[in-house]
Amino acid sequence: MIVSAISPTRAKPIDPEYAALELTPENRFLAWANGRENVFLSGMAGTGKSFLLGLWMDSIQGVKPDVTAPTGVAALNGKGMTLHRWCGMGLGPKLFETDEADWRTCRTSEQVRQRVTACKTLVIDEISMLSGRHFDFLNFLLKRLRGNNKPFGGIQIVAIGDFLQLPPVRIDQSLAYDWVFKSKAWEEAEFQTTLLEKNHRQAGDADFIKALAGTRVGMLVGNAREILQARIRSNPPMNMPRLFTHNTMVDRWNTGMLAELSGDVKEFVGKPSGDAREVEAIGRSMLTPHGLPIAGKPTEPLRLKVGAMVMITVNNSETGTVNGQIGFVKSLPEYEDGPVIVDTREMGDVFVTPWRFTFRWRDKTAPKI
């Protein structure tokens, strides 16, 4: 059903420049993208979506497309920025609100207006994570900012992603997924769809590729289950990321790994400011009925050593770091409120300084932590 939902209603003819080429999915994508069609590029993991996008981007002369993604880490992987920041939609539209109402609360700076006005092509990576409501509002927003009633204000959209990998983000888990391909904006865009099918990441292992492809669509045939189970590691390397079901298990693991490192521990403690009663009330509100910290509460206290693996948990436009970015502590501050230097794969050394969180309690003056 998903395949039929995202297939184009009509395929545009290929530009004569590409007519003599072998009509591989890759060449179709290049032909449509260079012909300024709206294109949706999809395929299972390992089929080269990001590689093909990079190849196309490098071939463009003059103004390059603007690259975005729904999340900070995905945007960083594509050397771009979050879609929300790019278009100035802030936290995004409210689920049951109108576009006009959301527009009135949207704060688009002059920098955003200039960026949107100058844009010719917008790349949206990991499109499957974007909800239909957000995509519809993006369409509305670009039309309004550019004064152009064409789809997306006349900007070419190149969307990349796999709807069988990452679903759209849901604030309310009781609601069904708001798939972007069911939105009015998706229909209006008239995407030309390119599906990459050849797996390059596991090339040479045909049985494993078949097992992965079957898992992707929920169909394990033949000995696929045995092939996958044979890959289970009973003792994975210690530096591999781990997933746990409870925060207490996460804390226990992280504490144990920190103890394995040599050197001294440096402890960082938050400094609340504001009315004492407000600060106390906020502190209580961030605990569960059992007295445990709620999910999302800043780690208190934060204990670090040189060499510790850490994750950035906020987007910082000044440093370019994003929520979910991983690195290793390279050095600890020698003075109060000094920076922690973190070695990241994407950006090299970044300076992480104390971050201020603002909490509002009953609409009164917000204490700051």
Where are the predicted features?
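Conserved ATP-binding/catalytic motifs of P-loop helicase motor domains
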Residues: M1-I369
